[in-house]
Amino acid sequence: MKTTAAAFAFSLLFAGFGAALPAQADSLAYGPDTCRNGFVWREAAIHDHVCVRPSSRTVAAQENAMALSRIDPAGDYGPFTCIDGFVWREAFPGDAVCVTPDRRSIVRTENANARRTRVLG
């Protein structure tokens, strides 16, 4: 009897938590990655959901399109070596698209501000 009562209580507790979590996520249009008004996903890669101004997403797309023209495959880092005047963007771990140092600084600031540009449910 005690085991049955404990199992019933546990199932109620578990069911309560299960019901509360999806309700919170469902209230956000894009789940936990929903951006505040005026912001969009940067999409430096398909999984990059840092919320930025639309102009920054446009710049990231342009950087991706020009990526091959900014590398020196014979450099110290092989196919990931940037030509002079460019550095890795580092929008996310493994992002080796070459950009200007100023642009990398902007991307780092965007990453640091990620919680402020996202709707917190």
Where are these regions (language model features)?
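Post-signal/leader-peptide non-cytosolic segments of secretory proteins
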Residues: 26-121
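C-terminal segment of classical bacterial N-terminal signal peptides
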Residues: 14-23
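Bacterial N-terminal signal peptides that target proteins for export
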Residues: 1-8
